Amino acid sequence: MSNALEELKKYTTVVADTADFDVLSKYGSQDSTTNPSLVFQAASDPKYKSLIDDAIKYVNAKSGLSEKEKLSLAIDKLFVNFGVEILKIVPGRVSTEVDARLSYDIDANVKKGRELIALYKEAGIDKERVLIKLASTWEGIEAAKILEKEGIHCNLTLLFSLIQAAACAEAQVTLISPFVGRITDFYKSKQGVAGFEASKDPGVISVQQIYSYFKKHGYKTSVMGASFRNKEQTIELAGCDLLTISPNLLEELKNADASLVTKKLDSTKLPSDIPNKLDVSHSNFLWELNDNEMAYFKTGEGIRKFAEDLVKLENQIKKLL
């Protein structure tokens, strides 16, 4: 019998937002997204101890590295180990995140992206199956532009505004991950409300606007809605190129009726009020981002949170080196 999850898959590529292998097998996800927070959670589970042990062994076999370089390589190798295992389960791609503390450094982002791809190659994984995740700062987008020209595909995350999305599209990145739930959180707090009806949810509307803008202007960059707070938000975005959904919401969709899902986003039926191409020059990008209180705040907050979880993971690994 069909359910809401199966129905959603008819219109949208469903991606599991998890580093838990059991979950990936259960829901038949096409791709998987990971981030420092998810890997930190998974790495605390004894069943993934072998992946940590392998990363430590890999680093200890290298000579001439400083303590800082050892730690950095161990984290990268651990992320790649998770990615390699995930790719044994999903038929598509895995997203692996660059250190959030590099979000304002073009060269460091490019270097880290290349290093992660080299580790995947060493493990026998083709770069076509990997997306390098970068924050949607000006520097992150510029780094993605360089990596994409080298054939390294990128997923621009922590994206909260049309200006960030437009800059990514002009940079010809493979995929963007506009966040829904964190936008919802911001406006719930600001307006002092308990929640929004899905069709009027500011986070949902943001993704709808980005999707329509990309399709109107013929951009090839895929839109993958991310960061959902309830199943209704995902249902309202049926038809989006991809949606990355957490395990608890995948379960809710699996248990919900298929009749709840109809195609909401359609590239052949776009609204009439889509803006012309935005000015994505450096100065205008910074101004537009600064002028959007929510996007400015949430981008910075998201970078800090990912950095915080990465430090926790580093502290865990440091004891083993």
From Swiss-Prot:
Keywords: Cytoplasm, Pentose shunt, Schiff base, Transferase
Transmembrane segment boundaries: none
Record GO terms (molecular function): transaldolase activity
Any single biological process term in GO: carbohydrate metabolic process
Major location (coarse): cytoplasm
Coiled-coil ranges per UniProt: none
Pathway terms, separated by semicolons: Carbohydrate degradation; pentose phosphate pathway; D-glyceraldehyde 3-phosphate and beta-D-fructose 6-phosphate from D-ribose 5-phosphate and D-xylulose 5-phosphate (non-oxidative stage): step 2/3
Entry function: Transaldolase is important for the balance of metabolites in the pentose-phosphate pathway.
Protein name according to UniProt: Probable transaldolase
Species of provenance: Dictyostelium discoideum (Social amoeba)
Taxonomic path: Eukaryota, Amoebozoa, Evosea, Eumycetozoa, Dictyostelia
